[in-house]
Amino acid sequence: MSKKEIKPIVLIVVFIAALITFCITTNKGNKDMTTKQADATLPVMSFNLDKIKINTLHGYTTEMDPTKMRDCVIPISDDRKLSLSISTYGMAVDRISYKIRSMDGKRLVADDEISSFSNKDNTIQADISMPNVMDENTEYLLVFTITSGQDNVYYYSRIMQTDGKAAAKVVEFAKKFHDETFIKDDKSFFTTYMETTTGDRNTLAHVDLTSTVSQITWGSMAAAQYTNPVIALKEINDSYDVVTIDYVMSCVDGKGETEYYNVREYFRLRQTESRMYVLNYERTANQIFNSENSFISDSGSVMLGIRSSEAEYRANEAGSVICFVQEGDLYSYDINNGMIIKVFSFRDAEGIDERENWNHHDIKIVSVDEAGSIDFVVYGYMNRGTHEGEVGTGVYHYDGLAHTIDEEAFIPSKTSYEVLKAEMGKMLYLNEKNEFYLMMDDSLYRINLGSMSVKKVVEGLSTGSYCASESNRYFAWVDSANQYSSNTIKVMDLKSGKTFEVKKGDDQYLRPLGFIGEDFIYGQANAADVVSDAAGNTTFPMNGLIILDTSDQSELKTYTPSGGYVEKISVDGYTVTIDLIAQNNGVYAEIGQDTIMNREADSKQKIALDTSQSDTKLTVSAISIAGGKKPDKLKQLTAQMTINSHDTTVDLKFDDNTVHFYVYAKGDVIFASDNISDAIKQANDSMGVVIDSNQQYVWMRAKKNAVNAFANIACNETDKDADSVVKSVSAMLTYNDVTVSVSELIGAGSSAVDVLKNNLPDKEILDLQGVSSEDIIFYISQGNPVFAMTGNTSAVLVTGYSSNGALYIYNPDNGATTSMSYEDADRMFYNGGLHFITYMTK
């Protein structure tokens, strides 16, 4: 063989050898630079109420904002004894201390250390005599601190000195009800509490008192309690108590495979001397996905089992990679390569740890590419790993080829997961330029993940002034200061960062309403039709809707009502439901609804969430895949975390002065808004309560059966000849020992709300719109009159209510107080646009 022939062969061999060496070295380096998440290390705290374990608390490694950490409430009796238990899981505990504060966190009530406690078999027991500093039946913040070496771990709760024996009976009953759900032979226990069967009989994912007793007792499923029930007291008040019970249920399916379910029971109970009343009972069950079980159907669908109807899932453009979130875990199913990858999970492969399974986080899938790489966001409480015990938002990239996860940013938060979810879950987006957008504290932020720089893109957003597309790619807003008088809407494409404007003439005002997919819906109103009543409430009657193609700003469809005006819309899929109003005697009132359709649903959709019926499980969910088939075999993988050599923390400075209202229902925050009226409606529908930013109750169902009409209600002398709006405001101020000329202030352009805010600085003024007369009696039960519009320029005060369905109405024109039924009052208030003003002491 000649030298010319040998030389190329040698070069090829050298190249191949070098390539192999490079690959081995690279793979070894990648292996060394990846790791699994560190195990959970933090202790768990709980309390004993008449020998029943309640109120399990999980630890935080940073001090949180205590006013945003409203969870369970610990009852203590007059003896002020508190029995505490801590599962240390091997952590050395050097010191345990606690602080008691007022609910707004401003006043320190007690600061003490637990001087004596036993520590045996990784369990600490302590009996504490709480200081005699708490007012009875008043909630306080309670913060425990466990010190281990140089590290502190914090635990947050509420505490109330109340009738501990009564609370114990409530807990005992809830536990008894829970135990009975596993007894199929004797169903007599439930007959007293069940309601008429009007609920869905074909589901075990959600059951309540309108379900069948068979559903309550798990039907034909061989349900078994796998973990001990975690019982929590969420609310204690004069009207009812709220208890939740969380546990893991196990069941062996027809194939002999064991399945696990996270189950929550919610009780709203009222206790009397004779019996316990179950006002509400609901149970939800969601299967914990296990890729080691059979989960691909014969048609290729991904079987998710019993779960809620709302699911987070996404596919790449080709439909070859399916990603989905189930009970806090992110999975990726690679169809072409026959792989199922557990991308992210706090749960270990073996067993169910109470710390790892504490499901106080959410995952949002941002994008999936053709290689199976995923951008996703994890927000909430971090159960283990680098950020164990922190609450925050983590931005992650999963490499579909290397099967590794890189943390690109972590944004810590001082609020609970529930509050974070209610506020930040509204807006999350990551584009291809590595720019991450999120909404917090009424502002839209952009974080450049390359430079870690932060920019506030839009600030001062308020309810009704903005909306986002379903994918969060498009964000539309008007200036909040000109929310009802803007002829320009800005629409930002977060993918490109570019903004375009929708603009009309000065005689037309615009309002962003929503999106159908990525198509933008906005309304327009004649400037002359937008009016404010004497109390300052603005009505925005829209004469038409426009649906805009965001890709080229072309108008796809316009809608003009055949009669009346558009008040608001709601979007469900490709259907827009339109609420219509018309003017009657100077006041706008609802006249019905209309619907329009935009584009047809995409018939070429690659995946969809479907349901089917099972003999034992009833309704089960699955992700159906177009053209799918069952693979011959499936490879199981678990992604590894990349070890970061740089700090990924992004510290956003939030405005603590922003006022928000939080709806707590069924043991969780279910809604957050700057609009008190929206919060009341949500709380009323969910049998919940409304809390403000200072942990103050600003609405609940009335705590008193009756309140006598307030005495000393009268306007001052300077306003006695004014109209009823002025005199009603004047009477509210006089009731609070404030004397000013309301006539002059309103004549100078101030609204009723402005006058009250400026002259009652120690009160939180609440401007209520669209609520009913039954909704306002809570404020009267707190000793506060309620201003109510009865026409465009007329008003009265509601000053009391009876136990037989009547309100006491103060008429400022004649100074008389008369009774009126709720029905008659609602008709009168309807003529005023259901507009009320009241206040709470700050």
Predicted segments with their positions:
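Core segments of small alpha/beta cavity-forming domains
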Residues: T35-K99, D104-L108, E139-S220, I296-M339, ...
